[in-house]
């Protein structure tokens, strides 16, 4: 069983208690904030699960969370279970049975928990079915990632696969069209691509982009057109920003097609 961690932040803590309250064992609330409109419902949720609620000073919560960004609440809870290759297979089988188009987000070597959290948040907002990451060289779902995700970490299925390239082959064999973002001569503008069917979108780190083997597995490479400004131009975006732009285009097309 995974060791309990200290999660923090109003939305992250509320999501854990709402989605999997039995995984939590203790709640710390900053002294003087018990009756805050955002904190009182959290205490009420904790009470329904018989979770110990302790009042503590701000500095004590900062020490527990290892961050001053706790917003007055810290929750001791087991980390959310992460899916594996078998869960991905089950997801694909379920999608075929339902005949519902799926939208998957694949993150290749995203090691910053802040970027992972931001991507999870955007994925929930844009209707992503699941987020897939490799088992190695990727950020885990840390309390910091959960805080940045503002509750999305407990809403979005996260699947960790042993080998990302092999998982991509599996997706393609199951009829999923795989797009990868890259600055490449063969890449097409994002808006020129059909993102309305069973689609997987692969995002790489802002430093190195997607790996060569990952790029080779993609059905089509795409890029986000950037025009720059009078002040100059840049060649890349933060991965969470780029992910938001890519997922928005997918969401826009799928809404227009009434998917």
Predicted feature residues:
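Short, hinge-like loop/turn segments at secondary-structure boundaries
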Residues: 70-74, 147-152, 196-199
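Structured adenosyl-cofactor binding patch, chiefly the S-adenosyl-L-methionine
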Residues: 140, 147-152, 216-259
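Short glycine-rich anion-binding loops that position phosphate/pyrophosphate groups of nucleotides
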Residues: 33, 79-81, 184-186, 206-208
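Short beta->alpha connector loops at strand-helix junctions that form conserved
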Residues: 57, 78, 108, 134-135, ...
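RNA substrate-binding interface of SAM-dependent RNA methyltransferases
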Residues: 11, 18, 22, 37-38, ...
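N-terminal positively charged helical leader segments and presequences
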Residues: 1-94
């Amino acid at each position: 069983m995974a060791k309990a961690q200290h999660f923090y932040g109003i939305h992250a803590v509320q999501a854990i208690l709402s989605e999997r309250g039995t995984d939590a064992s203790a709640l710390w609330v900053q002294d003087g904030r018990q009756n805050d409109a955002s904190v009182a419902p959290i205490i009420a949720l904790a009470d329904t699960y018989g979770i110990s609620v302790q009042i503590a000073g701000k500095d004590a919560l900062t020490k527990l969370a290892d961050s001053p960004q706790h917003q007055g609440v810290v929750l001791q809870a087991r980390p959310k279970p992460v899916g594996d290759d078998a869960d991905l297979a089950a997801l694909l089988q379920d999608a075929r049975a339902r005949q519902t188009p799926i939208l998957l987000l694949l993150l290749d070597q995203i090691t910053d928990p802040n970027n992972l959290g931001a991507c999870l948040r955007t994925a929930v907002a844009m209707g992503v079915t699941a987020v897939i990451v490799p088992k190695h060289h990727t950020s885990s779902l840390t309390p910091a990632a959960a805080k940045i995700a503002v509750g999305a970490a407990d809403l979005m299925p996260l699947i960790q696969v042993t080998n990302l390239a092999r998982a991509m082959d599996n997706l393609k064999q199951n009829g999923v069209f795989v797009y990868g973002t890259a600055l490449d001569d063969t890449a097409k503008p994002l808006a020129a691509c059909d993102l309305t069917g069973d689609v997987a979108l692969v995002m790489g780190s802002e430093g190195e982009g997607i790996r060569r083997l990952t790029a080779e597995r993609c059905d089509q490479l795409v890029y986000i057109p950037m025009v720059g400004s009078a002040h100059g131009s840049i060649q890349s975006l933060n991965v969470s920003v780029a992910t938001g732009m890519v997922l928005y285009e997918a969401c826009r097309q799928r809404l227009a097609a009434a998917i």
